[in-house]
Amino acid sequence: MKYFSSLSFLESNLKYTLTPEGTIDSKIFKTISSSSNYFRTVSIFDNESKGTISRDKKAIFSILTNSLTPTSIEDKSIGSMLGMCIGDAMGHRFEFEPVVYDKIVLTDMGKGKGGQFELEPGQWTDDTSMGLCLADSLLVNEGYFHPRDLMHRFLLWWNNGYNNAFRFDENKRSCGLGGNISGSLYEYVELKGQNPYTKYGDENTSGNGSIMRNAAVPICFYKDMNKGRNVAKWQSLVTHQGKEAYACCELLTFIVSKLINGEDLFNDVLNKLDKEFTCDVDSVNTLAKSEQEGDNVNRNWNWKDDNFKYSEERVNNNSGYIGSYCMDAMAMALHVVYTTKSFKDAIIKVVNLRGDSDSVGSVVGQIAGAYYGFKNIPIEWIKVIEKWDHQEIALRGYMLCHLFDDVKSRVN
């Protein structure tokens, strides 16, 4: 995949789009630095030099994780952010391999390099990188959804390595840019940022690229479902015209917000979706009800069925890419969390299905992490991720759920 060029228009706007309008008083938010040149190519967090991690950041992380109460808002928020990354990192090992049911091979982060990008255990792909861009955009803009800022961060990821897993592995560059998002970014560059909402594709362009990155939205707006769903929709529309894509983001936000608020995954959320969730896309309403669309077996979204499988027709057409359609990804993610009883079992089940396993794994991780929480994620998995993120993903989860403790909500 080629890297983008002719980004001078982006450089001229960086000062505006990457600088918060005000100062957040809380000490934890002061670990953000938008003035460092290093920030632009690596991380939102302050680093004095390459390979150096802020002592303040490490101290804050130690305090917040040691004082976390299981099933608390913070525990669930951090769990969802890390879940996104863990599902992505583990799922990459089998990404684009032909789908397989009921065969468990991978039960941990793996050993040695693996997957199509030959990643080390714990390194993530576009799913997490773009999810971190979304988180950073909300944090730096203090809860205001700024579509151009988000698109700029996506470009910085692909061109400069911002938010990728390789800040301590110079042999790698950003990886995983999908065809639909690539088209949207090229369009944005060609138009010099005039329209942040893509016209690439059409209203049926509904890949899984916006649900895979959605974790930050329900964490940030768990207190206000309507605002959360609104931001979920618009963050999808920057790269996907598809109605099903944005509606699946709304559904995912609805589910994760309820879980962060302490509702039970099975009794309060999944078994009540048919009565409590509705949107303006009929097919997604059918999916939420765990039903089939008429007599079309290839539009069967009955994820509550113990024997639920992907559409046989779509599997036969391209088995390795099954799950790349947002409806397939969402339905299978719900099936996996509905038929397992722990975060670990949910992740193991989804990544071993193969297909688009990193993106479907990312969605499973967001849901399972929000329900079971950070404290119920295997510590050995967390430590593998920490080798590459140095605890910054968890920090984002904590910061996002407390963002409006300090900042007045400003969302279009």
Mark where each language-model region is.
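Structured, active/binding-site neighborhoods that engage oxygen-rich ligands
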Residues: 2-412
